[in-house]
Amino acid sequence: MKRKIIIKTNKEAQVPVEALYSLFQESFRQWSDNGIDSPFLHKTLEEFGRVIERSAVFVALDADNAALLGMHCFTKYRSRYVFDYFLAVAPQMQGQGIATQLLQEEVAYLQQRGCRFMKCTTSAAAPWSVQWHLKNGYYIVGYNRSETSSHPTYTFRKPIAPSLLWSRPLAPLTAKLLYCLSWLATNICKSKSGKLNWIGRMAKRSLKR
């Protein structure tokens, strides 16, 4: 029988940061096991706690025993959009729709508050994450290489409010255009290691003027 799940903001649920941190580490072990590295995966409990303090967190709880099964952490920018920091589901519960339930609750919550879209990044070397985002209405709109990550990353955007460029059939075309521009900028301005090359350094200096 399928478990009954309750979705709440952590402001309501009051799950301790230690439990959130433990779930985060368990959920993202798959990444390190697959050789995917990122600075966020090395955060201490104290650093993780500071992220939680300045973010909105939704949690998925077992309706019978209130066990923590999943969480989604995001922060709001300029009132127009939110940036997803991370989405974590207990390993034994992955593939059962908990992440999608969390997302659905959050979209309703954000629409009521006038948000227009969600953004996030994920490693290009994590196909399970890439496919989940595409399946749940996100579009790939960016490409980047960084000195601090072991693999290139994709930037995703999920429209949550009506918009001409982000309604079908224009949304896929808009996303492809943004992705192509981002891919070109990254490959023109950065080396394979993610460092800025001379073109990138010149562009950065000109933007500061």
Q: What are the residue ranges of the model-derived segments?
A:
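Conserved beta-strand-loop-alpha-helix junction that forms the acyl-donor binding cleft
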Residues: 120-130, 147-150
